[in-house]
Amino acid sequence: MATSGANGPGSATASASNPRKFSEKIALQKQRQAEETAAFEEVMMDIGSTRLQAQKLRLAYTRSSHYGGSLPNVNQIGCGLAEFQSPLHSPLDSSRSTRHHGLVERVQRDPRRMVSPLRRYARHIDSSPYSPAYLSPPPESSWRRTMPWGSFPAEKGQLFRLPSALNRTSSDSALHTSVMNPSPQDTYPSPAAPSVLPSRRGGCLDGETDSKVPAIEENLLDDKHLLKPWDAKKLSSSSSRPRSCEVPGINIFPSPDQPATVPVLPPAMNTGGSLPDLTNLHFPPPLPTPLDPEETAYPSLSGGSSTSNLTHTMTHLGISGGLALGPGYDAPGLHSPLSHPSFQSSLSNPNLQASLSSPQPQLQGSHSHPSLPASSLARHALPTTSLGHPSLSAPALSSSSSSSSASSPVLGAPAYPASAPGASPRHRRVPLSPLSLPAGPADARRSQQQLPKQFSPTMSPTLSSITQGVALDTSKLPTDQRLPPYPYSPPSLVLPTQQPTPKPLQQPGLPSQACSVQPSGGQPPGRQLQYGTLYPPGPSGHGQQSYHRSMSDFSLGNLEQFNMENPSTSLALDPPGFSEGPGFLGGEGPVSGPQDPHALNHQNVTHCSRHGSGPNVILTGDASPGFSKEIAAALAGVPGFEVSAAGLGLGLGLEEELRMEPLGLEGLSMLSDPCALLPDPAVEDSFRSDRLQ
């Protein structure tokens, strides 16, 4: 017990002592806390004082430099230093304004709620356009609005605005953001254009503000006005902004705006110009429904309208189509191209193109010698053969025989008389496109053999003659009619008789005509169509060229469709009638014999070149650029010019045509004259030279 008692008291003492210790500890703790608090307060005070001073300094600095941060300063500088300077110069002492500003600023900043209604209003305005307080636009508007209230209010407003501007301006990013989003700012400031604000401000200031302040305001107004006229647009857009962020004057913002606007316009213009141009040039020209490979190229040609373009197109198409004939319209080649529907279409010229797209069948038709045959029919029994000259006759044929009246016109078959070999080649080229059209209705092409006469009526004499090649008349026919010449490649042309190919674009295939020689006898594609038959020299020295082009030469799968009952027969069809036949067949049926050799060659070449596919027309595998010249020569001087030669001619024509493309219509017409001389090998050579040039 004692122990316990002793312990008890001891414990009590311990406990008692403990409280003391606790109290001491507590006291110490409190003391420390107080010290810390004091230190903290000191620090806070220092910070606060520093902050205030910094703000004051900043305000003074900013004010001196211009209201608002660097950006606002810049803007103001652009808009007018007087506005900013006036406050500086104004009676308000920078120190006084600074102090006042500092106080107000402090109040406003710390308890923004306490901010005077003016400031709040300004802020609201600012925020309206830009919800963020950063928007510099609000400060400007608020400042201006404050100005009218009186010198003190104005000063106060300025001070307020400065702080807000400073705060907002302090972050360039904020300014940039606000500036970059001028639409809101502009929308807000725009309503109160600088000029408007100044006016109102000026009036209010004059009455309300101190004389000094009003003076300042006036200066500001003047500056603003000056600025406005000076930078009407800039002030409007930038001023609006500047008002908000004192950046109104900032030309930088306006510049970005303007540049943006300008860029937009120029891009639009560029886009409209460049793209539209390209589109017009490239896309529009192509047929609405161009055959993918050929037509795309073809349309270009078509657009080019010049034979040269056609030639290029043909080349591409022909190549793509593999209708090597295509362009040349070597009869075989032509057919071959015909076989390629696309090629055919490409073959057809721009006009042809049009017709091709719809008349394609026609083209084929005419091309198909069935229709051509008709023409040839008209001319001779050669119906097919004549038809064979679809290209040549095609023009006429087209119009006459086929609905492709357009093509006919295009072809200007009448114009194509072989007689004008010189002109014919170039013209032929031009008409060539039309020729494509001549293909005439698909039926024609279908009936190719059957229809020989069908086109004939349409074909009409010219066409018939052309087609016939019988046409020797062709000689009589103008060069244009001579168009057949490009079929000139007759051999290939004849080959083209194959209907199937013709259908698509037989026309180019005047070849069809050659092929068509015998509308009735469609030979197997494989069938060799040899224009073994030598045609009598006929008018053309070409005389008997044996258009030996075996169908195989044409190697047109389509040749099978050739209506040539037998190559010979086709050719033979009307040897007499075809006297020109060689020309007609080999060259363009229509082309008169004399013309045929050269004219045909040339025409053929031209035609081929035009179609560009001529060479492509593998029709005459033989056709080769090198051979082309020879072909021209051969056509001009070699009676025995064979289809293969014609094929070569096609190749040549293609090559030459391509070169010739630059010549254009004028060049073609020039060539036309030489075409007349074409019969003379020398002339032919010169003609070729021209083309090369």
From Swiss-Prot:
Record gene name: CRTC2
Primary localization: cytoplasm
Biased composition (Low complexity): 352-378, 386-424
Positions carrying Phosphothreonine: 169, 501
Residue positions where Asymmetric dimethylarginine is found in the record: 51, 99, 120, 123, 161, 168
Any one annotated GO CC term: nucleus
Name of protein: CREB-regulated transcription coactivator 2
PANTHER family: CREB-REGULATED TRANSCRIPTION COACTIVATOR, CREB-REGULATED TRANSCRIPTION COACTIVATOR 2
UniProt feature, compositional bias: Polar residues: 1-20, 174-188, 339-351, 447-463
InterPro entries recorded: TORC, TORC_C, TORC_M, TORC_N
Region of interest (Required for interaction with COP1), residue spans: 209-215
Modified residues annotated as Phosphoserine in this record: 70, 86, 90, 136, 171, 274, 306, 368, 393, 433, 456, 489, 492, 613, 624
